[in-house]
Amino acid sequence: MRPSSPSGGRSSRTRVVALLACLAMLTACGQATQTALTGTPSATESAVTPGPDAPTSTSEVDVEREGMEPAVVTAVRYAAHQTYDRLVIDLEGDIPGYNVKWVDEFLQDGSGKPIDVRGGAYLQLTLFPAHAHDEDGRPTWKGGPIYPADLGNLTEVVRTGDFEGRVGIGVVLARQAAFQLREQEEPTQLILDVAH
């Protein structure tokens, strides 16, 4: 039989484990959640944790993924932060392949017709395989196709298409700036930060 401790039989190790469990619970309760209308700027900080580094690249990004079911775009949200603007693409399913590059103008997928928006720079994101509609053809990313943003650098978001397993998202900026992309799971999101 063990001798009893002054704390009513609990060992120091048990107290430490209990303290760590309480801290974990408090941390989980303290995380912010955000709900925003689809395609609208968010008044609060994103629930996505901030990136470890400021955006530093202006180079094209191309990530290919094959043999997967198409992801479904459920929302695109955006918010201004102190030194950058953040665009969050909410997805159902796994993160699809994607391409991000600077373009001279946005074109409608399928028709190739120019989309009339004005800005200083245009960043085109294309997700594949992906859809922005359900099995019955109803949009899952509602509104648009042009969503005003008026943030530090990001001025508009454009749905350039949802065609043949590809979803196009145009980011209209006041000026070309460094950007970074991050993938997040649980919830599944592709996150684009663009410097001011």
Identify the residue ranges that each predicted region occupies:
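Signal-peptide-cleaved, periplasmic/extracellular N-terminal interaction regions immediately downstream
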Residues: G30-H196
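Bacterial N-terminal signal peptides that target proteins for export
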Residues: R2-A18
